[in-house]
């Protein structure tokens, strides 16, 4: 049954949904990586698709930008459509000197300046972490593909244009590998509703060094990340 934000029917989504931020990226993934594709939703142009990868059902849907947006879609997918596994696929900025452009980062945990998880946990700190089985499977699949991945803590920011000076230096000191805007929220929703979640990111920018990927390199690293994510989706 359709929800306020997802006009699909029960059974339209696979148990595992890959979620990029951009709905057009979801369409690209469906058209270029999946077979037997069916579009299942389009409310507010947030496109969702279900198809098969190596004979197994997989869905892909955009989640928008930021924790409030992604939390709505993840909540409804899990609670109303029976989705069991959420795998966020996207890009991130890096601040750590040891992280390079095109690195693939798997978010074992996600710190944040958002208060959403404190709201969930009576104003206490909540350790927003990936599901271990998804994490372990993704690392195994990356190794089978000879794809190097970095596993560690990331930071989910509420502000893209942050005025907070000195924060990047502190992130580097604490060993945070990348900065996105959604992972901590997705992990929180999944934990609250009893589902599993993982975040896989490609480094598209190095914030402290002022480096950015070219379009060609961005596409190459995206392809490697998608292969890891899809192999994870069909091997859990």
Curated annotation (Swiss-Prot):
Gene Ontology BP, a term: purine nucleoside catabolic process
Its EC number(s): 2.4.2.1
Active site per database record: 205 (proton donor)
Family statement drawn from the similarity comment of this UniProt entry: Belongs to the PNP/UDP phosphorylase family.
Residue sites binding phosphate per the record: 21, 25, 44, 88-91
Keyword Transmembrane helix included in the entry's annotation: no
Top-level class of the enzyme under EC nomenclature: transferase
MF annotations from Gene Ontology: purine-nucleoside phosphorylase activity
Residues of the site described as Important for catalytic activity: 218
HAMAP family: Pur_nucleosid_phosp
Reaction catalysed by this enzyme: a purine D-ribonucleoside + phosphate = a purine nucleobase + alpha-D-ribose 1-phosphate; a purine 2'-deoxy-D-ribonucleoside + phosphate = a purine nucleobase + 2-deoxy-alpha-D-ribose 1-phosphate
InterPro entries: DeoD-type, Nucleoside_phosphorylase_CS, Nucleoside_phosphorylase_d, Nucleoside_phosphorylase_sf
Annotated residues for binding of a purine D-ribonucleoside: 5, 180-182, 204-205
Gene: deoD2
Function: Catalyzes the reversible phosphorolytic breakdown of the N-glycosidic bond in the beta-(deoxy)ribonucleoside molecules, with the formation of the corresponding free purine bases and pentose-1-phosphate.
Pfam families attached to this UniProt entry: PNP_UDP_1
Subunit structure: Homohexamer; trimer of homodimers.
PROSITE patterns: PNP_UDP_1
Keywords: Glycosyltransferase, Transferase
Protein name stated in the entry: Purine nucleoside phosphorylase DeoD-type 2
Gene Ontology, cellular component aspect: cytosol
